[in-house]
Swiss-Prot record:
Keyword terms: Cell inner membrane, Cell membrane, Membrane, Transmembrane, Transmembrane helix
Cellular component GO terms held in the UniProt record: plasma membrane
Source organism: Methylibium petroleiphilum (strain ATCC BAA-1232 / LMG 22953 / PM1)
SUPFAM superfamilies linked to this entry: Multidrug resistance efflux transporter EmrE
Alphabetical list of NCBIfam families matching this protein: PRK02237.1
Major localization class: membrane
Descriptive protein name: UPF0060 membrane protein Mpe_A1656
Amino acid sequence: MLDFLRVTGLFFVTAVAEIVGCYLPWLVLTQGRSAWLLVPAAASLAVFAWLLTLHPSAAGRTYAAYGGVYVVVALLWLWRVDGVVPTRWDLVGGAICLAGMAIIALQPRAAS
């Protein structure tokens, strides 16, 4: 269970790095913010890619499980950064995504 919590925490940090790396260019392109924001955006996406290499499972399984956490972090971003309160539908969808992530992450593993 401790490994599950560690991996979930790593997924959370990975999702934040990805969202920041995409949000900053969005600010530049849609809100007229300084192009200098592209520098930390690129750094954030590089950190995101590096963080993905730290996950213990096969890449495809890691990306599938990570997707559930990403959805929840994006909903938190919607609420805290964009100032939009998630709807009941958003929350139910996020819960379903987390359930899918847990099923993937907690599946029985063959003994090595």
